[in-house]
Amino acid sequence: MENCIEVKNITRHYPQFSLTNVSFNVPCGSVVGFIGENGAGKSTTIKAILGLLKDGEGSITVLGEDSRKLSPETKEKIGVVFDGLSFPENLTVKQLDKVMGGIYKTWDHEKFFGYIKKFELPLDKRFKTFSRGMVMRLSIAAALSHATELLVLDEPTSGLDPVMRSEILDIFLEFMQDESHSILISTHITSDLEHIADYICFIHKGSIVFTEERNEMLEKHRILKCTDDQLAAIDKSDIIGMRKGRFQNEVLTVNAAKYPDIPADAPTIEEIMVYYVKEQ
């Protein structure tokens, strides 16, 4: 199997939002970072991938199966972290362990409680008393505690302090030591992706802007630091987005080589996203 997720031309229409011909792949053995501003369509796309949105055009396969008709065996291989609490709020960690053990044949009690201890989560407090950071740590622990081959993560590090975020990213990297494992991670904390992502998929206003290998994307984009006169000399077709200042202008481009006399800096993933959105 070449791709563990294949999204082909999915279209979904809602009163104030649409996904339009969304297509991208998650190659097996890779981490794909799914980026876009709030409301761009990340969470809706993830719900479609998980078979939670039945209507609409296009097709999605997950681990070789139609996402709307996943077999119990395939569901065992998918770990999911939603952006928020996805378990009944009156449960405790101990109760959740029993519930999940009844759902997943491959549920690993020892591994689950190992993560719970690592994440310093209480065993007997109800989830409704948990902070957002605690909820995300709980969800990650559960997602990793069965025979998971594919992680689908919606804002998994949101609400976590920098130290815990770093620990979580290390856990994801450890998960990826197995070459059969794959991750699709949606996040607005794009700096996280600079540590773990192999590919970046950028969605804006319900449409895919690009899907590219991370290092290649970072290498080809440059931010030109230019005067007004230099800006006037730049071909408009070379300008992806720009920011005008009192003393200096910044232009995102993939054609910096055409302007050797203009200083150029390497952008971050966040800067690339911001400039694309500013232009559009």
Where are the regions a protein language model picked out?
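Conserved ABC transporter NBD signature motif
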Residues: G58-K69, E73-T74
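Walker A (P-loop) phosphate-binding loop of ABC-type ATPase nucleotide-binding domains
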Residues: E37-G41
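Catalytic Walker B motif of ABC-type/P-loop ATPase nucleotide-binding domains
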Residues: L151-E155, L160
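Helix-to-loop junction immediately C-terminal to a conserved catalytic motif
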Residues: L50
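ABC-family P-loop ATPase nucleotide-binding domains
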Residues: E76, V80-S139
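Conserved beta-strand
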Residues: V7-I10, F17-P27, F34, G58
